[in-house]
């Protein structure tokens, strides 16, 4: 429920990617694959990978956040809340506070939100609700992941998919509410389809006390199940969001989907009867950057002049959990 006179507007976007590119041809030196095989099945041509001692999750997130603040014409000290959507923090206790310090956002509360590839969309909705409640007026929402840390580079089923990056948007209180609707869902019964699971070794602490210590396994995925899930659930939730907002799908200017696989993007557009040329995609350059995909492709489209003030955008994130969601918003603001 929106309080009278307190709506939400997206006033700026930003992004950051590592400087190092890993091409499909380079991947063919690691696993049995080829540029043609990867492109034809995923739409991916290359991806970025963070280099140790040069880039970190926190540094990429902070750079994207700073870019978004500059686009919104704001100083970091004006931010009330920082939400960092990530599954690959530099510190398991969370990296949002590191980002807060790097930005100099001394007045902001900061915390991580973990929902894998749905994370940015879930964080966007969470930030909007803080504004609508009247608790905060300016929220910085960042989606960032460094999945190269948790990729099995000997598994061609997964290593061809993932890349590193960060994207961000600024949410501000607005008399005109630009977030027109949202829906979020989770189905834990499908959790095993996409995991980055903790693997423990049992150790005896005392004669009658045993503990488990270990680390995380690389990303594991049942690609066929995830594809079937995405092409069914994503169109459904987008249609529900549009219906509740009273908006026809043909009024949508841009379809902004989690960049998982070009086949999924095309299938969702076809099922919604939305022209593929209205689907934003940068998979060819970055691959699947998890929680960063939506804000990264959004920011590139804004900077390229594709997205104009007043454009209606239907967004959907989906992934591990399994979780999925949709949000409908207009770009450009009156604050």
Swiss-Prot record:
GO cellular component, one term: cytoplasm
Record-linked SUPFAM superfamilies: Thiolase-like
Main location group: cytoplasm
A Pfam family recorded for this sequence: ACP_syn_III_C
Active site: 117, 258, 288
Stored CDD domains: KAS_III
Reaction(s) catalysed (UniProt annotation): malonyl-[ACP] + acetyl-CoA + H(+) = 3-oxobutanoyl-[ACP] + CO2 + CoA
UniProt remark on domains: The last Arg residue of the ACP-binding site is essential for the weak association between ACP/AcpP and FabH.
Purpose: Catalyzes the condensation reaction of fatty acid synthesis by the addition to an acyl acceptor of two carbons from malonyl-ACP. Catalyzes the first condensation reaction which initiates fatty acid synthesis and may therefore play a role in governing the total rate of fatty acid production. Possesses both acetoacetyl-ACP synthase and acetyl transacylase activities. Its substrate specificity determines the biosynthesis of branched-chain and/or straight-chain of fatty acids.
Subunit and partners: Homodimer.
Name assigned to this protein: Beta-ketoacyl-[acyl-carrier-protein] synthase III
Gene: fabH
């Amino acid at each position: 429920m929106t309080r009278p006179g307190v709506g939400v507007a997206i006033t700026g976007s930003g992004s950051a990617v590592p400087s190092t590119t890993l091409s499909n041809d380079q991947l063919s030196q690691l696993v049995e694959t080829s540029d043609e095989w990867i492109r034809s099945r995923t739409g991916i041509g290359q991806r970025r990978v963070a280099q140790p001692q040069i880039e970190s999750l926190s540094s990429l997130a902070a750079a994207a956040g700073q870019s978004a603040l500059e686009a919104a014409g704001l100083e970091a000290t004006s931010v009330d809340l920082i939400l960092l959507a990530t599954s690959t923090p530099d510190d398991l206790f969370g990296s949002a506070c590191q980002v807060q310090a790097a930005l100099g956002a001394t007045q902001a509360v900061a915390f991580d939100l973990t929902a894998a590839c749905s994370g940015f969309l879930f964080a966007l909705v969470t930030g909007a609700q803080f504004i609508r409640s009247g608790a905060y007026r300016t929220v910085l929402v960042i989606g960032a992941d460094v999945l190269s840390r948790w990729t099995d580079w000997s598994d061609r089923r997964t290593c061809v998919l993932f890349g590193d990056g960060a994207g961000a948007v600024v949410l501000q209180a607005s008399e005109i509410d630009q977030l027109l609707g949202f829906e979020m869902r989770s189905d834990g019964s499908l959790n095993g389809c996409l995991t980055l699971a903790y693997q423990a070794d049992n150790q005896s602490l005392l004669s009658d006390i045993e503990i488990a210590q270990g680390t995380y396994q690389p990303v594991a995925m049942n690609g066929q199940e995830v594809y079937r899930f995405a092409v069914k659930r994503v169109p459904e939730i987008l249609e529900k969001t549009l219906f509740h907002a009273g908006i026809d799908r043909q009024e949508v200017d841009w379809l902004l989907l989690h960049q998982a696989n070009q086949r999924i993007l095309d299938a969702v557009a076809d099922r919604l009867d939305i022209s593929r040329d209205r689907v934003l995609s940068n998979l060819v350059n970055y691959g699947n950057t998890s929680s960063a995909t939506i804000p990264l492709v959004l920011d590139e489209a804004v900077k390229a002049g594709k997205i104009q003030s007043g454009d209606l955008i239907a967004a959907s994130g989906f992934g591990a959990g399994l979780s999925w969601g949709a949000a409908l918003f207009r770009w450009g603001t009156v604050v």
